[in-house]
């Protein structure tokens, strides 16, 4: 045998010619790692090369098989530390059927999902006017990309309208204050002063009107006062102070038998799946011990032994269960004892005890569960826990996430569950007798999946950046490995995190094509997961419902940002398309809101879970109210949008506002306080054809800038200047001042010179706006509240008979600007420029401009 034949040839283990992505796409691959094509398409994380030797992908860690906790693998079975190798035993018939269904659903979902190949990045700027940061006495806030404030700051039309509205309200409050008519309520925040004052003035006018005396006036007076008092009581209760020595648990808690039979039974059956952070057997044990030692024996609540945390958990569970029954609208006889429990002081008690511990330094198991329950309550409760735009939720959420990481509740409880080594001390609560290491891992998984989803959820709702920066690709082998809905959603976490990164890594340069592709992937995968759960005894329909609405909300906010970008970029074709797409999305979401309120049986949402689903519906409906004015203010720029179409949009806004505030305004503090500015916005937009709202807003703000320059502005010198609050108006003023010797119509300057997309003609693209009247009909024929009190139409609205009596004198002294108001929009820029008005005349004229917007029927006493 020759030498060559005796030497064994060494086999080369070279990588395949292309990465798995390029192989799937049938595209070119430069064989770098990651390859250039994947870098360009944003698929860096999934750019994988398969080797001939092992056949294992070189990818980020993934959880391919999450075995039950008590079936730990031996070291020989592990392919790598913490990850369990797939066993070669044949699958059961049930597992085969399960994954056969997955493949069938994937093929079905492909009918409506078309993957995008070789799509070049397309970047848009979601912060054309920068980030929106607000500082005030009590808090500083950087608002997320999709909050109301950020949307208004991004949109020049909404920004100008909101600026005008705030200045007009300030002037009116100064007018009332000088007359001694301002109203204050010590239990309400300072921002409520305008609401109370305007409503009191409204009430005075109604009481003076003989026509309105009687039932209408008494109803107005009773309902309005009760709402102000109700929300003032919320704040007073939550601000109550306690002394630990005087707190007796039996004064606040029902007997143990009632707690177990009514409260815990309801919690376990209907609510636990929403917040599955407990082992219910262990929780019941701790509650029983607490009642035996504290309630029945009358012992003081021990902070050292963490009795106070068990007490807080009981209080929060009772309050959450009571909310469930309260918002279900079921007969009070179903849970009579529960509804009799006074929970008004519970939140103040919880806050008192939470800060008795070193919550900012260290955390234990019960304390973490209490914090999570508090976060859940802030989300669902009618009090203003999260703030009107969820801007106050990140600090508590950050505390929860930090506490989880400090306690070892993280991705390791899924990827390396066998690596945890516990030392459970004798005084730990829950004790070792009742809670073993395997129980810890089980609850750790439940808590981490819950906290993780809420972190991702807030990114989709408000556009804020996720606080948990790590994700893993999770694939569970059996349905038994996903005991909660949140654990099942871990398979979507990688996609949700990619969406967050694409959005927040650089908001000024967001890859829109990649974002659309990721959203489509998320919809497709969620559709598969949702379909797989249909055979379960408990479908958890409210979770699927919320997830669908969250995705729709994200799409709505993104569409608005997309439209604004095309407008700034003067991309007329894409602007028109996004304008129509955004309007269609608004109509679609509004229909969903209508069905939620008036056809809820078809949604298959349990009425006892509505206290939870109400929150996402409230956020989505409010977003519609924020965005619709942007369409109305832009209406004059489209030939195909006539005045009659704008009136339909305004009627639609009125209908959506009536539904939103009548369904939520009586109960939710944050909705009630938004009603004031929403009503003002409606009055701004609901103008006659001659008094175009956008022209009047521009004119008012230009006059205000002139007053600032002359030092005669009503704005306090401690406040920011208009030119700093709304820089786009300062730029517009500079453009207007270029027309020396001429006085053109300001709308012509705005559309043709300053904001040049308006100069394009609809005929250039063949664009024809589709109003979708048929889909809007429920809101145009708003008869739902015709036979009962409509809170939206009632608040801040004077009787029409007040018009003549209060405006006759004002009309005689006002300097009207009817000629300017009636100027055609497309007027040629050739008229001589009239001399500037004196400062005093500017002030009178400015109030006249406010009268053009606010019908004297509403705010006649201010002039």
UniProtKB/Swiss-Prot annotation:
SMART domains: GAL4 (SM00066). GO terms for molecular function: DNA-binding transcription factor activity, RNA polymerase II-specific; RNA polymerase II cis-regulatory region sequence-specific DNA binding; zinc ion binding. Residues 52-81 are annotated as: Disordered. GO terms for biological process: positive regulation of transcription by RNA polymerase II. Keywords: Cytoplasm, DNA-binding, Metal-binding, Mitochondrion, Nucleus, Repressor, Transcription, Transcription regulation, Zinc. Coiled coil: none annotated. Residues 52-63 have a biased composition (Polar residues). Residues 19-47 bind DNA. GO terms for cellular component: mitochondrion; nucleus. It comes from the Eukaryota. It is found in: Cytoplasm; Nucleus; Mitochondrion. Belongs to the OAF3 family. Transcriptional inhibitor with a significantly increased number of target genes in response to oleate. This is Oleate activated transcription factor 3. The lineage of its organism: Eukaryota, Fungi, Dikarya, Ascomycota, Saccharomycotina. The gene is OAF3.
């Amino acid at each position: 045998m020759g030498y060559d034949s005796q030497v064994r040839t060494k086999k080369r283990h070279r990588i395949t010619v292309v990465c798995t992505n390029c192989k799937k796409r049938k595209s070119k691959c430069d064989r770098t790692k990651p390859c250039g094509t994947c870098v360009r398409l944003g698929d860096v994380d999934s750019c994988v090369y398969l080797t001939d030797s092992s056949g294992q992908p070189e990818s980020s860690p993934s959880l391919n098989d999450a075995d039950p906790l008590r079936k730990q693998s031996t070291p020989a079975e592990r392919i790598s530390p913490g990850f369990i190798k797939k066993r070669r035993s044949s699958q059961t018939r049930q597992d085969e059927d399960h994954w056969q269904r997955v493949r069938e659903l994937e093929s079905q979902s492909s009918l409506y999902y078309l993957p995008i190949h070789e799509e070049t990045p397309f970047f848009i700027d979601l912060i054309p006017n920068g980030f929106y940061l607000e500082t005030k006495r009590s808090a500083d806030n950087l608002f997320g990309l999709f909050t109301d404030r950020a949307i208004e700051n991004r949109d020049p039309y909404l920004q100008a309208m909101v600026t005008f509205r705030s200045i007009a309200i300030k002037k009116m409050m100064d007018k009332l204050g000088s007359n001694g008519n301002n109203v204050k309520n010590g239990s309400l925040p300072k921002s409520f002063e305008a609401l109370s004052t305007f409503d009191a003035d409204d009430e005075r006018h109604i009481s003076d009107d003989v026509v309105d005396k009687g039932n209408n006036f008494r109803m107005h007076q009773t309902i309005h006062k009760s709402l102000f008092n109700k929300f003032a009581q919320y704040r007073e209760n939550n601000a109550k102070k306690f002394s630990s020595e005087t707190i007796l648990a039996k004064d606040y808690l029902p007997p143990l038998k009632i707690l177990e039979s009514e409260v815990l039974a309801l919690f376990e059956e209907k609510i636990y799946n929403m917040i599955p952070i407990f082992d219910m057997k262990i929780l019941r044990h701790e509650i029983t011990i607490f009642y035996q030692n504290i309630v029945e024996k009358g012992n003081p609540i021990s902070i050292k032994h963490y009795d106070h945390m068990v007490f807080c958990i009981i209080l929060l569970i009772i309050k959450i269960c009571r909310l469930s029954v309260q918002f279900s609208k079921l007969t009070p006889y179903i849970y009579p004892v529960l509804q009799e429990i006074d929970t008004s002081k519970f939140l103040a008690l919880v806050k008192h005890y939470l800060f008795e511990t070193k919550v900012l330094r260290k955390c234990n198991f019960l304390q973490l569960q209490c914090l999570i329950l508090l976060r859940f309550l802030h989300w669902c409760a009618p009090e203003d826990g999260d703030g009107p735009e969820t801007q106050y939720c990140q600090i508590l959420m950050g505390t929860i996430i930090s506490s989880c990481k400090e306690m070892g509740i993280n991705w390791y409880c899924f990827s390396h569950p066998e690596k945890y080594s516990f030392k459970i001390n004798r005084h730990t609560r829950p004790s070792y007798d009742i809670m073993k290491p395997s129980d810890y891992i089980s609850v750790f998984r439940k808590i981490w999946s819950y906290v993780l989803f809420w972190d991702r959820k807030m990114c989709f709702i408000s556009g804020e950046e996720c606080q948990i920066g790590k994700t893993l690709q999770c694939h569970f082998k059996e349905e038994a490995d996903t005991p909660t809905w949140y654990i099942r959603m871990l398979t979507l976490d990688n996609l949700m995190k990619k969406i967050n990164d694409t959005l927040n890594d650089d908001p000024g340069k967001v890859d829109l094509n990649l974002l659309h592709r990721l959203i489509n992937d998320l919809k497709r995968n969620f559709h598969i997961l949702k379909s797989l759960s249909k055979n379960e005894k408990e479908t958890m329909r409210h979770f699927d419902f919320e997830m669908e609405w969250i995705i729709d909300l994200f799409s709505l906010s993104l569409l608005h940002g997309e439209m604004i970008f095309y407008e700034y970029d003067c991309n007329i074709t894409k602007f028109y398309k996004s304008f129509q797409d955004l309007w269609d999305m608004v109509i679609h979401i509004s229909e969903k809101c209508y069905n939620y309120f008036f056809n809820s049986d078809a949604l298959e949402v349990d009425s006892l879970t509505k206290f939870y689903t109400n929150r996402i519906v409230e956020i989505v409906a409010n977003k519609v109210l924020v965005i619709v004015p942007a369409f109305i203010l832009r209406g004059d720029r489209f030939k195909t949008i006539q005045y009659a179409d704008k009136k339909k949009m305004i009627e639609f806004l009125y209908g959506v506002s009536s539904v939103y505030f009548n369904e939520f305004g009586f109960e939710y503090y944050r909705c009630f306080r938004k009603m004031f500015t929403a009503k003002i916005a409606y009055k701004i937009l609901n103008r006659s054809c001659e008094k175009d709202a956008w022209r009047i807003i521009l004119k008012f703000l230009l006059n205000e800038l002139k007053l600032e320059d002359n030092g005669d502005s009503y704005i306090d010198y401690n406040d920011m200047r208009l030119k700093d609050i709304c820089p786009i108006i300062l730029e517009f003023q500079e453009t207007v001042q270029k027309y020396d010797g001429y006085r053109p119509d300001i709308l012509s300057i705005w559309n043709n010179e300053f904001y040049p997309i308006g100069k394009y003609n609809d005929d250039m693209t063949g664009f024809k706006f589709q109003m979708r009247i048929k889909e809007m009909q429920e809101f145009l024929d708003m008869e739902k509240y015709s036979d009962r009190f409509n809170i939206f139409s009632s608040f801040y609205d004077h009787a029409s008979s007040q018009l003549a009596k209060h405006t006759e004198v004002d009309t005689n002294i006002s300097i009207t600007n009817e000629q300017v108001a009636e100027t055609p929009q497309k007027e040629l820029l050739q008229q001589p420029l009239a001399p500037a008005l004196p400062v005093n005349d500017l002030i009178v004229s400015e109030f006249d401009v406010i009268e053009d917007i606010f019908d004297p029927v509403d705010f006649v006493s201010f002039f």
